[in-house]
């Protein structure tokens, strides 16, 4: 297949693009790293699918810069959705679990708006808290890996491994979007308190109240996705255990 991936140099986009290329698909990488600005999006060749991952994330930043979130996540997405609808190209796009409490932040609002303007044949995947190699340094699991956690909260998070997110996207590329629902939740389906996963990692920090703009619990109902044959493979605790084991091994038997 020929697949356009917007945001292909981002966290999820990079993992997805690498797998698609290895599997022999043609991939058009649409992002600034490859000389394409999302505001100039166009399709001038035969394309089988568009995976729209380009966006500005980060709930806290959106409180300070709401305008850029609306412009990038909504206005530019609207252009992409309309172009693909006119050309009858199916779309898989990145939504967020933030839509369940969208009013709390400009980021959540922008994702809720994205879902509202999407056309039939355009499926939104509501990612929960994605972790893995390449995630932003400010994300909790990155801070755990780097031992830079300063405090924890009692907010509940559904951590989902980036490889499992990629497998969800690939499932729709394989099965197509015909007959599918407009949105699916992509998460492990199991929530864990932030303070508990931090403690599991052996990090001792104070527990504080989380920000009002953040969801208190983003645990996904992934039953619709599971019904299509998808299953998560790696939990947050398992990932932390692997990190701890690797760190210990490197200390007692460093690679030479």
Segments predicted by a language model, with ranges:
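A recurrent short beta-strand within the Rossmann-like NAD(P)-dependent oxidoreductase core
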Residues: 129-130, 150-157, 169, 173-189, ...
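Adenosine-cofactor binding site in Rossmann-like domains, unifying the SAM/SAH pocket
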Residues: 27-42
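NAD(P)H-binding glycine-rich loop region in Rossmannoid oxidoreductase-like domains
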Residues: 42-72
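NAD(P)-dependent short-chain dehydrogenase/reductase
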Residues: 104-108, 112, 116-166, 170, ...
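Amphipathic terminal alpha-helices
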Residues: 235-256
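C-terminal "lid/loop" region of Rossmann-like NAD(P)-dependent oxidoreductases
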Residues: 183-184, 192-222
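Conserved Rossmann-fold NAD(P)-dependent oxidoreductase catalytic core, especially the SDR/UDP-sugar
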Residues: 78-108, 123
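N-terminal Rossmann NAD(P)H-binding glycine-rich loop of SDR-like oxidoreductase domains
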Residues: 3-23
């Amino acid at each position: 297949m020929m697949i356009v991936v917007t945001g292909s140099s981002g966290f999820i986009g990079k993992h997805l693009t690498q797998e698609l290329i290895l599997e022999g698909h043609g991939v058009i990488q649409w992002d600034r790293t490859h000389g394409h600005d999302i505001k100039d999006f166009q399709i001038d060749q035969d394309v089988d699918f568009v995976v729209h991952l380009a966006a500005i994330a980060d709930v806290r930043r959106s409180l300070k810069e709401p305008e850029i979130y609306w412009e990038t996540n909504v206005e530019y997405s609207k252009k992409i959705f309309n172009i693909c609808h006119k050309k009858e190209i199916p779309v898989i796009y990145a939504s967020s679990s933030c839509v369940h409490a969208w009013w709390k932040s400009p980021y959540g609002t922008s994702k809720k708006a994205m879902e509202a303007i999407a056309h039939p044949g355009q499926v939104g995947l509501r990612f929960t808290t994605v972790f893995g190699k390449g995630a932003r340094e400010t994300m909790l699991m990155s801070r755990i890996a780097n031992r830079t956690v300063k405090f924890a909260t009692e907010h509940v998070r559904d951590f989902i491994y980036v490889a499992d997110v990629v497998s969800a996207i690939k499932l729709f590329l394989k099965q197509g979007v015909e007959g599918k629902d407009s949105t699916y939740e992509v998460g492990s389906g199991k929530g864990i308190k932030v303070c508990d996963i931090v403690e599991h990692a052996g990090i001792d920090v104070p527990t504080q109240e989380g920000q009002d703009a953040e969801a208190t619990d983003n645990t996904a109902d992934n039953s619709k996705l599971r019904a299509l044959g998808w299953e998560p493979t790696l939990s947050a605790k398992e990932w932390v255990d692997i990190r701890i084991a690797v760190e210990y091994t490197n200390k007692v038997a460093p690679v030479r």
